[in-house]
Structure formats: C-alpha cells, structure tokens
UniProtKB/Swiss-Prot annotation:
Compartments, as annotated in UniProt: Secreted
Superkingdom of source: Eukaryota
Organism taxonomic ancestry: Eukaryota, Fungi, Dikarya, Ascomycota, Pezizomycotina
Record-given protein name: Antigenic thaumatin-like protein ARB_01932
Positions of disulphide bridges: C124-C144
Leader peptide range in chain numbering: 1-20
InterPro entries per UniProt: CetA-like (IPR006771)
PANTHER family: DOMAIN PROTEIN, PUTATIVE (AFU_ORTHOLOGUE AFUA_5G01990)-RELATED, DOMAIN PROTEIN, PUTATIVE (AFU_ORTHOLOGUE AFUA_5G01990)-RELATED-RELATED
One GO CC term on file: extracellular region
Protein's job: Might be involved in the inhibition of growth of fungal competitors and pathogenicity.
Family named by the database record: Belongs to the thaumatin family.
C-alpha cells in the first residue's frame, strides 16, 4: 500500500512537468513551398509547408542527440541534395527551451523579407534576420521557459 502511495505521488509530481511544454512552430509567409525535416537521433519524413500554412511539433527531448533540428529548405528533398538549409534548433531542459537559428550550405531564404524567431512569452528575445541572412556579429541562441511556444516565421516582416 505504501508503494502505491509513493508511486501515485511520483506520477502526480511528474505529470505537470511533462504537460507544461511548448511547441516549435514554423509559419510559411513566403510565396512558395518550404520543406522541413525534424532531425534528432534520426531524420523524420519530409513535411511540405505550403504558403500561408504552419508546421508544429511539441518540444521533445531526443536521448540520442539531446536536441532537435528543424531543417528547412526551399526545394523538395533539399537536405539530401546539398541545397541551402536554414536550421531552427531547440534543446529542452527541465526549466527552459534553448533555441537558435543557423544556415548551412548557403542562405536558403536570402533575398526574402526576413526570418523571425519569436515566442509566446514577450520577455524572451526574438531572433531577426533581415533579408533572410544572418546579421554579422549577432547572437543567434536564446532561451525561454519550456512552456512557451517558439515560432520561426519565413518571409517575415520586421519585429515591432
């Protein structure tokens, strides 16, 4: 009986912890499709984000890599053919979600209005890339409470 009480107490203590997790969201405000792969210890299937639509996943911890990279290209099968990639990555901890933005193999969204990473918590910092290109000398890693949603907007307008 004592074991059941301890087990129930442990489950009750863990439940709010696991329930209070935000989402990684990618909004496509561009005129063309964007292609996304969720990558941790393995590569998830290609997701097509059509103009005006959104991709969302609940923050999760990957036991193999520790974090998740949402790899985004402007061409189908882009992570397999050397196309420029924008990487919106996050790492979930007990209290925070660390997030960052980077490019590999070129700047996938160069020449667009911009890329904006914003959160549902106004106290957490934005990441803004005018013209879809990382500004020189700017920090691109930030943190927010783990229950906040964090959104990357493709072809975004400047933050207010």
């Amino acid at each position: 009986m004592q074991f059941k009480a301890i087990a129930l107490t442990a489950i009750a203590a863990i439940t709010p912890f696991t329930a209070a997790v935000g989402h990684a969201i990618v909004e496509n405000h561009c005129d063309n499709n964007a292609y996304l792969w969720s990558v941790g210890g393995s590569v998830g299937p290609q997701q097509t984000i059509t103009p005006g639509h959104t991709y969302s996943e609940q923050f999760r911890y990957d036991p193999v890599s520790g974090g998740i990279a949402l790899k985004i290209t402007r061409v189908k099968d882009g992570i397999y053919n050397g196309s420029p990639q924008t990487i919106f990555a996050y790492t979930l901890t007990d209290t925070n979600t660390f997030y960052d933005l980077s490019d590999v193999f070129g700047d996938a969204f160069a020449g667009t209005s911009g890329l904006l990473v914003s959160t549902s918590n106004p106290d957490c910092p934005d990441i803004w890339w005018p013209n879809g290109v990382p500004p020189t000398g700017q920090k691109f890693t930030s943190a927010c409470q783990r229950d906040a949603d964090i959104t990357l907007t493709l072809c975004a307008q400047p933050p207010k």
